[in-house]
Amino acid sequence: MEKVNLAEKFGAFTEHWRPKIVGELNGQEVKLVKFQGTFPWHHHDSEDELFLVWRGRMRVEFCDRVVELTEGEFLVVPRGLEHRTAADEEAEVLLFEPTATRNTGSAAESHFTAPEGVRI
């Protein structure tokens, strides 16, 4: 059991859309990811996702609305709900989701699909 310094961990990588695992609890992974640009539309059949903004601003877009998130705010996206994430400038985001959740969910494999299990 070791404490995690989020600023140090976010400083350890530069790529966007590539979640890094920094902790696990009760079948869930705590991941750090940097967003910039727009991610593809997708959904997760079996997993809810929690997006918590550490630094910057991001939005979660749904078919019928857009939710803007700023530092210290989070949103839980229920399983099965079509969505995409976006950030005009770089945002640092914590994700809480079940182990082995594919970041692109139902979307076809693409350059956005991150390798699973990458830890920092």
Residue ranges and their predicted role:
Residues 1-31, 108-120:
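A short, N-terminal "cap"/entry segment at the start of jelly-roll beta-barrel domains
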Residues 15, 29-45:
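Conserved short histidine dyad/triad with adjacent acidic residue
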Residues 26, 54-55, 70-71, 89:
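A cytosolic small-molecule/anion-sensing beta-strand core signal
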Residues 29, 38, 57-59, 66, ...:
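Structural motif
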Residues 34-35, 44-62:
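Short, conserved beta-strand element in jelly-roll/cupin
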Residues 63-80:
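Short acidic-glycine-tyrosine-enriched beta hairpin
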Residues 79-109:
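Ligand-binding loop in jelly-roll beta-barrel domains
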